[in-house]
Amino acid sequence: MKPASVIIMDEHPIVRMSIEVLLGKNSNIQVVLKTDDSRTAIEYLRTYPVDLVILDIELPGTDGFTLLKRIKSIQEHTRILFLSSKSEAFYAGRAIRAGANGFVSKRKDLNDIYNAVKMILSGYSFFPSETLNFISNTRTPKGGHHDMPLSNREVTVLRYLANGMSNKEIAEQLLLSNKTISAHKANIFSKLGLHSIVELIDYAKSHELL
């Protein structure tokens, strides 16, 4: 039987290598690409079928949610496992609603990634029970969800702003115009009721987004 093909996307080389070594003990899994560059991954996906993409939500130059949509537009059956070192309670819920097949916090045991990959390739999803309980317990009486009122792109901009980046630097990083970043910034401050960068940094820290 042909091994399942896997792409590993993470900004840290040591993380990419560690995951490859971890998956290498399973002869039914083949890592076909390791990269931190979304363009490299997209080019590969346009040429070769891929069973699973292990995707860091906080990749440089993009965000995992935007990249998930691009991947699905090329190969709709490719499965996605999100990784993040940031707030599990916040990001895992968004991962479920974005259509990902699993989420693993990089703060947890590395074997969680291996177990998640096996389950997802077997046709299951992998979301920690704490995440599912969190989502269940935060349902509003009308069936909605208590959630940060920002889009995924606005969350990315918020994180960059909280890390001290200028509008111009963020625009260059995300390949957007200064005008677009300014609009995102205004929306962030308006939606969250913030009045200064100091308040924005405090907000990001309190939500474990830094």
From Swiss-Prot:
PROSITE patterns linked: HTH_LUXR_1, HTH_LUXR_2, RESPONSE_REGULATORY
Domain of life: Bacteria
A single Gene Ontology CC term: cytoplasm
Positions bearing 4-aspartylphosphate: 56
A GO MF label: DNA binding
NCBIfam families: PRK09935.1
DNA-binding residues (ranges): 167-186
Gene3D superfamilies, per the entry: 3.40.50.2300
Domain Response regulatory: start-end pairs: 5-121
Localization per Swiss-Prot or TrEMBL: Cytoplasm
Protein name, entry field: Fimbriae Z protein
Keywords noted in UniProt: Cytoplasm, DNA-binding, Phosphoprotein, Transcription, Transcription regulation, Two-component regulatory system
Keyword Cytoplasm found: yes
GO biological process, one term: phosphorelay signal transduction system
Residues in HTH luxR-type domain copies: 143-208
InterPro entries: CheY-like_superfamily, Sig_transdc_resp-reg_C-effctor, Sig_transdc_resp-reg_receiver, Tscrpt_reg_LuxR_C, WalR-like
